[in-house]
């Protein structure tokens, strides 16, 4: 299967004038839901797929004979505005980079992500994501469609009423979804930080306002609390067990475990992060220990029938453009069937 063929098709369509149909022929067309057609033509008009013809039209606009075309990939967990600064370190507000430099870096991140075949991402963690989302949406800069949570809600001291207010403030400011922290970082052990009641208040308000809630949760206890609270999606889950995965199945909760990219990126670029916040010797040791656990959880999740398994990488500074790495990890290390991995990354 050729990811490149899919990418070229997407870029070709994006570069066409608004008027007039574009026809894309490929020897194999995947629908993102498990089905496929051989020797088919995708017909696109004004940026929208009109139909798929089960034959080769005369003189297609783009001919990918021998290649595969599939829907654009979706990464449900990135940090689009996180980048490495001029000193080769993770950008922080105090590193001297100007807003213009930060903006160009964010645009470069998005372009790299698009070139990797990802046409939709959820960027969950920064207010700056909103401007990037809007610029891409207007066609001013190339990049994937962005959904953003703006700033995450991470303060465990907030009351239920305050959490509802925080959710409402973000939605009113243009958030497409809400991100909550129900546990500590993996670098700090991943223990639960918010109660089920707090999560119910926040996730309930998000649902009332018509946006999904995505919860950072590593420990089994924090995952269980978020699922029972009715939250829409769990991210990470390094310490998830069969009990909480089965609970997610029963409750219809979406689950986005990271197979390895986020941890490997931090470890491979240790000197770029070390000394910032919880990027300590202990923090790096915790991430190294997390890799086999994350692969095992991904394997368990992939083998669990009925689980709403989505695809998210937690791509941060240094990882943009490598978003497909975890697809390979899911298939090669976690044993997920290739078509199931594609479905998770295109249709859910």
Residue ranges of each PLM-predicted region?
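Metal-associated gating/positioning segment near the N- to mid-region
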Residues: 64-138, 197, 221, 226-229
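Active-site gating loops and adjacent loop-to-helix segments of metal-dependent hydrolytic enzymes
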Residues: 81-103, 111, 142-143, 147, ...
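Divalent metal-dependent hydrolysis catalytic cores, especially in the metallo-beta-lactamase
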Residues: 103-129, 143-153, 175-185, 212, ...
